Each structure stands twice: as C-alpha cells, then as structure tokens.
Amino acid sequence: TGMVERRKGGESGVKWLQAYRGDAFWQALSDGVWSRELMDAGLSRSHTLSQARPGFNNVFPTVGEMKQLCKDPVAYVYEHIDGLQSTMLMMSGLVEDFNFAAHIKGRDEPLSTQMYLPMPAARTTLANFFSPLVNNVEKMFLTGKPTYPVERTLLTSGLVIAGVDSMHQGQVKIETSHLEAVQYQ
C-alpha cells in the first residue's frame, strides 16, 4: 500500500480481493492473473533469492524450480477503485526479503526496488518493528499530527481481513465495498 498510495490521485479505495494458495497460486500465475514480468522484476531485486541449482552460479530460477523451492506460495490480488490491480506474493523458501515492482506510465521497463527491512537471521528472534511504531506514536503525541495517513491503517487492516476471509472461504473473490470509500493522498 505504501508504494501505490503515492500514485497520481492517491489511494482510491479497494473493490475486491482474492487469495491464491498452493496449486491455485501456480495456476493463477500460468493464467496471467498477475504479471510475470513484474514478479520477475521484484524477485530480481531480492538479496535472498534461493539458488535452484548447485554450484557457484546466479541463475534466475524457472517456474519449475520455483515450485521446488517454494512449497506453499500465497498471492493476494486486489483491485483499486481507479482500476489499478495490486498483487502481494508470499514465496517462503524462494525469498526472505520484501521487494516491489510496478509498471510506471512513461517507462518502458518496470520499476523495481527492495524495501530494506532489517530482518534477523532465520529462527533467531523477531524483527523489531515495535520501536519504530512507538517512535511514530510519540511524534504524533508531541506534534498532534500523524506521521502517515491514518487511513492506511484502515485500508491495510481491511485487506488483511478480506485476505483471511478469501482463504477461509476457499480462495474466492471477496467484495470489499467497505474499503471503497477509503481514499487518501
């Protein structure tokens, strides 16, 4: 949400969300439910992309190799009121970091970046996201102004609930009329 809310016109609200897990994930990828070009652009920014082949190499994995590395992938696809489609992919076993890719009007190539979130090594401890949150709460108390749009919390919470509902109901499309009015710049 943080990246796409900065587009011209800002956040416009969300119409629907659908989850895909396991075999449904791979079928949706094959069917073009989300952009393979953008997925690859995001994966190419990863600092933790697993190598599918032994040896000293840096070969981008094929879909078949991704399936071997990523046993339980999850995708959440949702459409904004202005028609923008967003997809969040969770591909544990293939990547351990947070990456973003988008088509930008006027650019031939996708924009992609890594969102560096300092994560500890696997199975050691939890990342400390609480201290930055408390810092932002403190700034809000001191200035009387939130450090980010509070509507973002409403939108992301609503998307999480819709994602859980979609998964629980058999990966169906969930209409999110309650999120259509969540608009901000």
Q: How should these model regions be labeled?
A:
Residues T153, G170:
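Hydrophobic, well-ordered secondary-structure elements that form the walls
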Residues T156:
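Short acidic/histidine-centered micro-motifs embedded in hydrophobic/aromatic stretches
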Residues I174:
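Hinge/cleft segment of the Venus flytrap/periplasmic-binding protein
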